[in-house]
């Protein structure tokens, strides 16, 4: 079978959001196109998604986070004394060794991207999706300036059990069992489900949200997570994706989201959530060596998860350049996805399931979205999931929803606000 041409690969990318390079295992992802496959009547606003690494006044793919050049006349400034680099401590040396091991792999993946000229040309237009007019994009930007709901705070007040979300089902969906086209259900500590084949528009406290087809969410704090555990193991999950709010001083400074002490995550009932045929567990981890050792030595063993592989997310700007220097110690332009297998019984889930062996050191590349927003890589993991093709998927600490996914967290509706999602033009 002939390998696809460059034009065919680009054509597939424009439809799916996934670009597979020739003679490379690296993959480029456009999260907006991937997410849009979850919706029937709506689309993710590319202007809203790519809010950081595109300049609002420059559509040529230049980053607004690039550091401006210093003025030529700087004689009045006092020259700062260069600090001598201090020697690395033992933990930092281990982290540096990890980095040096993966560095050639990341460099090769980045060189592959820079050699894909047709893809690079397409990247410049990621933020100006032709499905929306300039006026619609400006309207979306104005919405983003409005205050959004703080679900974490709402869930803590005494009125939280009284808050209801109204689901407005499309007329061609058969939901007569609910007594009409609109139903209202508790939004906290409750399974909110859209079993239909179309997106559902929802309203909560005068804010509008879009619920993708075939999706479900449960919004609560950590102490209520046991409510996710199924009564029967056959109703468990084959794919569990986790993006914990790790302890992070930077996140506290930016006030983007609340974090939790790392040891809190030891209590996650991963084994009880696992399907009888086993589960692939995918855990997002930062590059802090202390955290990596915690995951390897304590967290995975406490969950009963057997380590399988590590994937790497390489972050680039719209021009294809890395968002920071590869060797910048505290701000590396990549993050890790640590993968392992969980089973209900003391069996080797890898041998039992007969699924495709999971490769190590897979690299996927994308332009980052909002702070700490991860690219939607769930579909890329499906071939490594144990069990039947009817995969039950769960995301923990989710901040957005996806078709076919069950999502839990204290703000799973965050990116479902209509300031991030616009109606398809054909529906206007």
Model-derived regions, located:
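Class I S-adenosyl-L-methionine
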Residues: 1-242, 246-266, 272-274, 288-428
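Conserved beta-strand signature within the Rossmann-like core of class I S-adenosyl-L-methionine
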Residues: 277-286
């Amino acid at each position: 079978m002939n390998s696809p041409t460059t034009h065919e690969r680009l054509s597939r990318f424009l439809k799916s959001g996934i670009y597979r390079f020739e003679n490379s295992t690296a993959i480029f992802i456009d999260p907006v196109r991937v997410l849009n496959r979850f919706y029937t009547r709506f689309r993710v606003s590319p202007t809203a998604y790519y809010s950081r690494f595109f300049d609002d006044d420059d559509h040529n793919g230049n980053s607004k986070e690039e550091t401006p050049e210093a003025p030529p006349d700087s004689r009045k400034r006092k020259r700062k004394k260069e600090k001598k680099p201090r020697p690395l401590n033992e933990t930092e040396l281990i982290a540096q060794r990890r980095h040096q091991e993966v560095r050639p792999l990341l460099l090769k993946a980045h060189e592959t991207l820079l050699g894909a000229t047709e893809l690079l040309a397409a990247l410049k237009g990621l933020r100006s999706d032709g499905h929306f007019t300039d006026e619609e994009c400006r309207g979306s930007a104005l919405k983003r300036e409005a205050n959004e709901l703080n679900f974490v705070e709402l869930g803590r007040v005494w009125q939280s059990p009284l808050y209801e979300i109204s689901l407005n089902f499309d007329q061609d969906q058969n939901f007569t069992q609910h007594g009409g086209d609109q139903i209202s259900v508790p939004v906290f500590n409750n399974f909110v489900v859209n079993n239909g084949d179309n997106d559902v528009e929802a309203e909560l406290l005068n804010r509008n949200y879009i619920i993708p087809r075939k999706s479900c969410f449960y919004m609560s704090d950590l102490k209520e997570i046991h409510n996710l555990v199924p009564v029967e193991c056959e109703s468990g999950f084959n794919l569990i994706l986790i993006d914990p709010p790790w302890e992070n001083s930077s996140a506290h400074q930016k006030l983007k989201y609340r974090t939790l002490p790392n040891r809190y995550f030891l209590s996650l009932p991963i084994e009880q959530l696992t399907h009888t045929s086993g589960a692939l567990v995918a855990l997002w981890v930062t590059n802090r060596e202390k955290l990596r050792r915690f995951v390897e030595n304590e967290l995975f063993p406490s969950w009963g998860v057997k380590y399988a592989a590590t994937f790497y997310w390489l972050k680039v700007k719209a021009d294809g350049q890395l968002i920071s220097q590869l060797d910048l110690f505290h701000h590396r332009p990549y993050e890790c996805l640590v993968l392992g297998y969980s089973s209900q019984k003391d069996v080797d889930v890898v041998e039992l399931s007969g699924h495709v062996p999971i490769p190590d050191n897979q690299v996927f590349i994308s332009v980052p979205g909002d702070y700490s927003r991860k690219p939607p890589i769930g579909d890329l993991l499906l071939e490594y999931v144990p069990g039947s093709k009817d995969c039950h998927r769960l995301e923990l600490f989710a901040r957005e929803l996806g078709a076919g996914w069950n999502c839990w967290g204290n703000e799973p509706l965050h990116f479902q606000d209509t300031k991030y999602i616009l109606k398809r033009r054909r529906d206007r």
